[in-house]
C-alpha cells in the first residue's frame, strides 16, 4: 500500500481543503486529481508558471532549492513571494506531511 500524507490546499485565502495524497506525486498532480483549480498549462514540463503555489516557510525550507530552470519560470509567475514554488516541481515525501499549499488568486500564462 502506498504511504499517504495530508496536504491542505488554501483557496482564495479562505477555503481550506485537506486531502490524503500518495508520496511520490507532485502537488500539481494532487491538485488535478482532486479537481482543484491549479492550471499547469505545460503539464509539468517546466515550460510555464501556471502551477505557481505559495508555501509556509516551514515546508518551503524542507524542499531542495529550486533549479535554475524553475527560478526562471517563477520570475514569470503572478504574485511571486519568497516561498513561491512551481507545483509540478514539489514531489511529496513523508517529510512534507501536513504541508499547506496556497493557490494564487490568478495566474499568468504567457504563450510562446
From Swiss-Prot:
<feature type="binding site">
    <location>
        <position position="88"/>
    </location>
    <ligand>
        <name>[2Fe-2S] cluster</name>
    </ligand>
</feature>
<keyword id="KW-0411">Iron-sulfur</keyword>
<dbReference type="InterPro" id="IPR012675">
    <property type="entry name" value="Beta-grasp_dom_sf"/>
</dbReference>
<feature type="binding site">
    <location>
        <position position="42"/>
    </location>
    <ligand>
        <name>[2Fe-2S] cluster</name>
    </ligand>
</feature>
<comment type="function">
    <text>Ferredoxin are iron-sulfur proteins that transfer electrons in a wide variety of metabolic reactions.</text>
</comment>
<dbReference type="GO" id="GO:0009055">
    <property type="term" value="F:electron transfer activity"/>
</dbReference>
<dbReference type="GO" id="GO:0046872">
    <property type="term" value="F:metal ion binding"/>
</dbReference>
<dbReference type="InterPro" id="IPR001041">
    <property type="entry name" value="2Fe-2S_ferredoxin-type"/>
</dbReference>
<dbReference type="GO" id="GO:0140647">
    <property type="term" value="P:P450-containing electron transport chain"/>
</dbReference>
<keyword id="KW-0408">Iron</keyword>
<dbReference type="InterPro" id="IPR001055">
    <property type="entry name" value="Adrenodoxin-like"/>
</dbReference>
<feature type="domain" description="2Fe-2S ferredoxin-type">
    <location>
        <begin position="5"/>
        <end position="107"/>
    </location>
</feature>
<feature type="binding site">
    <location>
        <position position="48"/>
    </location>
    <ligand>
        <name>[2Fe-2S] cluster</name>
    </ligand>
</feature>
<dbReference type="InterPro" id="IPR018298">
    <property type="entry name" value="Adrenodoxin_Fe-S_BS"/>
</dbReference>
<dbReference type="GO" id="GO:0051537">
    <property type="term" value="F:2 iron, 2 sulfur cluster binding"/>
</dbReference>
<keyword id="KW-0001">2Fe-2S</keyword>
<keyword id="KW-0813">Transport</keyword>
<keyword id="KW-0249">Electron transport</keyword>
<protein>
    <recommendedName>
        <fullName>2Fe-2S ferredoxin</fullName>
    </recommendedName>
</protein>
<dbReference type="Pfam" id="PF00111">
    <property type="entry name" value="Fer2"/>
</dbReference>
<feature type="binding site">
    <location>
        <position position="51"/>
    </location>
    <ligand>
        <name>[2Fe-2S] cluster</name>
    </ligand>
</feature>
<keyword id="KW-0479">Metal-binding</keyword>
<dbReference type="InterPro" id="IPR036010">
    <property type="entry name" value="2Fe-2S_ferredoxin-like_sf"/>
</dbReference>
<comment type="similarity">
    <text>Belongs to the adrenodoxin/putidaredoxin family.</text>
</comment>
Amino acid at each position: 500500500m502506498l504511504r499517504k500524507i495530508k496536504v491542505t490546499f488554501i483557496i482564495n485565502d479562505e477555503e481550506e481543503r485537506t486531502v490524503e495524497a500518495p508520496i511520490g506525486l507532485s502537488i500539481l498532480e494532487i491538485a488535478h486529481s482532486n479537481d482543484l483549480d491549479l492550471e499547469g498549462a505545460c503539464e509539468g514540463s517546466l515550460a510555464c508558471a501556471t502551477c505557481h503555489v505559495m508555501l509556509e516557510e516551514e515546508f518551503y525550507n524542507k524542499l531542495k532549492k529550486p533549479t535554475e530552470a524553475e527560478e526562471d519560470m517563477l520570475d514569470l509567475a503572478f504574485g511571486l513571494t519568497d516561498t513561491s514554488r512551481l507545483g509540478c516541481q514539489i514531489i511529496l515525501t513523508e517529510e512534507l506531511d501536513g504541508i499547506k499549499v496556497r493557490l494564487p488568486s490568478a495566474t499568468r500564462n504567457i504563450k510562446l
